[in-house]
């Protein structure tokens, strides 16, 4: 019998550390909490050397024929101690093609929007910017691969440079260029102009989070269904999973019945309410 996966429980937490290879002062502490059950919303914070990344996200997914479209919906912020600047950015969406038949392919699409108000900086990175329409693809081929991305960096509304490259390869920043000036260059010419490598998948070492040795009692590792599953007792795991889900439904009904102007539900921030409405639509 097909069993449903374990879904996060409201209030469930997880703590871990991304360990730096050489300098422990550059370790990154990670904290995650499930802050909404319906729709599911996860809040997160990563504290590192002179920076703090934090935000929350809901999840959207829809099936279109032989493809799955999905992504995270919600803001992410990075605060820097050095100058007090904060970068806000959004996540791109994903296409997972070939879910039922054919070759399975994962692609980013749409865009990421970055803003930094202290220095009046912004950048909109577009994934697969030269994508052809279904009809257009019959008449001409696309000049850039599907993993290509491009974005103009602006300061005070004026373009000061371009980010361009492949999220499966190398991404460069070209100061003083525009999207038009760069797209008119041949690959050989791009090598000769001033540029800075800002991402190289061959150089990026995967980071693994080491779970906390002293987590909160609400840590995901203490869930009774997960403990039973790890021990190989599938029947007990399913029973405990159903108990947790039923308890969560009862508590949600109580919160809904007892909500008032003074309740937590009525005191949600405007951005959280917008996110909940977006995931429900």
Label the predicted regions.
Residues 1-281:
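Extended acidic, Ser/Thr- and Pro-enriched interaction/regulatory segments
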